[in-house]
């Protein structure tokens, strides 16, 4: 395991547990991620927790059980998110499915000199950007969950 910092997006938790790496099959993966949370290497913003709270499923239950996973939107995170939105206002949207959590997930990684982990895929344009598009433009490292697992050197 590395001592790199990772900021998890909603999609990494939700899609990770629901679709990609179900805990009924990949139980040890989630134990490893829980260890990374306990070690302070994985965090998410409380805006992600609010988004997950609207659900009634395994992802919500697991996230709620991770006491150290979510961090409040402290001033440096808010300031960084404001800078992100000044450059990329279309990262969030009142209509459609773009999440208000996205700039804060990126801001957390920026403030902690870390990497974003998301299951969003880049659109390849900044007109209607997703997390990987904005990360690429701002020079913030961004991985999907499989790439995160590989970066840890974990094998199963």
Language-model region placement:
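Short, well-structured N-terminal submotif of metal-dependent ribonuclease cores
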Residues: 1-44, 51-64
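Noncatalytic, typically N-terminal accessory segments of nucleic acid-processing enzymes
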Residues: 1-3, 14-16, 89-96, 136
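PIN-domain endoribonuclease scaffold, especially VapC-family toxins
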Residues: 36, 46-99
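Acidic, metal-associated active-site segment
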Residues: 97-116, 130-136
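Acidic, metal-coordinating catalytic cores used for nucleic-acid/nucleotide bond scission
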Residues: 50-51, 98-101, 121-127
């Amino acid at each position: 395991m590395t001592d790199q910092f990772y900021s998890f997006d909603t999609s990494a938790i939700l899609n990770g547990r629901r679709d990609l790496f179900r805990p009924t099959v990949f139980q040890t993966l989630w134990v490893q991620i829980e260890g990374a949370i306990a070690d302070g290497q994985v965090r998410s913003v409380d805006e992600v927790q609010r988004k997950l709270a609207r659900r009634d499923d395994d992802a919500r239950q697991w996230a709620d059980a991770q006491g150290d996973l979510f961090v409040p939107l402290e001033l440096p995170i808010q300031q960084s998110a404001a800078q992100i939105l000044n450059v990329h206002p279309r990262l969030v949207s009142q209509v459609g499915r773009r999440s208000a959590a996205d700039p804060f997930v990126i801001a957390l990684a920026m403030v902690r000199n870390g990497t974003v982990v998301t299951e969003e895929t880049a659109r390849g344009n900044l007109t209607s950007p997703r997390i990987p598009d904005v990360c690429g433009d701002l020079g913030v490292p961004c991985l999907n969950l499989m790439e995160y697992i590989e970066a840890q050197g974990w094998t199963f």
